[in-house]
């Protein structure tokens, strides 16, 4: 049986009641790891249980070359909203940094490889495109770029959120502009590629500073991967990492968009052409392309924009129908859901209206996990959220939080 990180029986940690009052029935909280659900260069992710509720715990080895978890915590708290999993706790022990957050469903790569032809339909891909663009618009408006857009980093929600897409893994994310002046970082050559070469933009592969356009271009490659089940630069013989990046760059440059989009709806070709031609500082026209993919489904293919994907099961549909009826009863508004398409299309507007702006002390309040036994652990200057995000060097300045041993 595989050894897995766990909480010592004699130890645990306290947590702030403001994080999640429902879980704070006792002052002393312990999580029990159940199984590994993910792994990467950063470390491992486990499904965990506490008080009959399930969470995800990300473990980052303290001896790893890069420590990305602190960056991820600060950015996720700043971005918290409809598309970002909620953080429950952050701490460390002798060997690991640990992040506890909402348990999500499968990622899009996992869902893709389980399909019959290892492809998604036009409808499913368009539904995903609409949500991906919405998510990027949300984080870009908050001055953040992700820099590692790929199928593995988009996950579906569980239970009542099983039609919604979430973005994860913000360890490589950064500010692309000042939140005060909106001035973007200089367009300069970097030392190496940041992100995943298969989906990275041409500019990123050329090791240039990234901006909003690079996240969107990566979405374009992800969409073609969903529709075709592969990309022209997959499966090449590679000698080294440097050789791989060079070969992928050459292949991307040498493959025309027309060839890439052969036999696909024009909307996908138009999107990639647009993202490739964006200027470094140019603001993308997110809503135009969201509407294009919406219309592709509802007008050209005459289908409902209902968030029913290729992988959606009958059981999930029954749960959604039950929730839908409950919402009707709760709202007591016969006209509110008269047209399903209108309701779906306006989901984002409703969410945005209900969203709370991030307050300056949110990061401090949400992540002040204090002690083991009776000892305060490693209390090192928690910066207020506002101050963190006003600092253009967020990635270089490590954000230390009040942590606790698990």
Model-assigned labels for residue ranges:
Residues 2-26, 34:
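Juxta-kinase regulatory segment immediately upstream of eukaryotic protein kinase catalytic domains
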Residues 140-158:
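Catalytic-loop of the protein kinase fold
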Residues 34-40, 45:
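Protein kinase glycine-rich loop
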Residues 74-82:
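Structural motif at the C-terminus of the N-lobe alphaC helix and the adjacent alphaC-beta4 loop
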Residues 86-97:
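Short beta-strand micro-motifs within the conserved protein kinase catalytic domain, predominantly
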Residues 104-114:
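Structural motif in protein kinase domains
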Residues 49-70:
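ATP-binding glycine-rich loop module of kinase domains
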């Amino acid at each position: 049986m595989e050894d897995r990180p766990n909480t010592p029986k004699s130890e645990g940690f306290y947590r702030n009641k403001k994080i999640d009052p429902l879980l704070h029935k006792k002052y002393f909280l312990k999580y029990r790891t159940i199984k590994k659900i993910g792994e990467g260069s950063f470390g491992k992710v486990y499904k965990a249980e506490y008080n009959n509720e399930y969470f995800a715990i990300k473990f980052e080895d303290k001896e790893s070359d890069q420590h990305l978890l602190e960056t991820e915590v600060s950015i996720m708290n700043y971005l918290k909203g409809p598309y970002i999993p909620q953080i429950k706790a952050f701490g460390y022990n002798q060997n690991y940094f640990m992040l506890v957050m909402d348990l999500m469903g499968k990622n899009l790569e996992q869902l893709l490889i389980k399909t019959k032809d290892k492809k998604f339909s036009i409808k499913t891909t368009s539904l995903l495109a609409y949500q991906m663009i919405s998510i990027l618009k949300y984080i870009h408006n908050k001055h953040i770029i992700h820099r590692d857009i790929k199928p593995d980093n988009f996950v579906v929600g569980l239970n009542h959120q099983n039609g919604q897409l979430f973005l994860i893994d913000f360890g490589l994310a950064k500010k692309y502009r000042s939140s005060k002046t909106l001035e973007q970082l200089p367009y300069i050559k970097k030392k190496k590629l940041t992100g995943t070469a298969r989906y990275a933009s041409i500019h990123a592969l050329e090791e240039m500073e990234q901006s909003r356009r690079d996240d969107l271009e990566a979405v374009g490659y992800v969409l073609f991967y969903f529709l075709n089940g592969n990309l022209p630069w997959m499966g090449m013989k590679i000698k080294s990492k440097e050789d791989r990046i060079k070969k992928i760059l050459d292949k991307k440059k040498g493959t025309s968009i027309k060839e890439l989009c052969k036999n696909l709806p024009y909307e996908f070709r138009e999107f990639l052409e647009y993202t490739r031609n964006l200027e470094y500082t140019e603001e993308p026209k997110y809503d135009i392309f969201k509407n294009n993919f919406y219309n592709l489904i509802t007008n050209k293919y005459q289908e409902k924009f209902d968030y029913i994907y290729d992988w959606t099961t009958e059981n999930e549909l029954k749960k959604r129908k039950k929730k839908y009826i409950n919402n009707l009863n709760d709202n007591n508004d016969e006209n509110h859901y008269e047209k399903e398409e209108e309701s779906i299309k306006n989901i984002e507007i409703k969410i945005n209206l209900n969203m709370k702006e991030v307050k300056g002390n949110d990061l401090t309040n949400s992540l002040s996990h204090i002690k083991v036994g009776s000892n305060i652990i490693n209390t090192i200057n928690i910066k207020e959220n506002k101050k963190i995000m006003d600092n253009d060097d967020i990635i270089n300045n490590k954000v230390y939080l009040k942590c606790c041993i698990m």
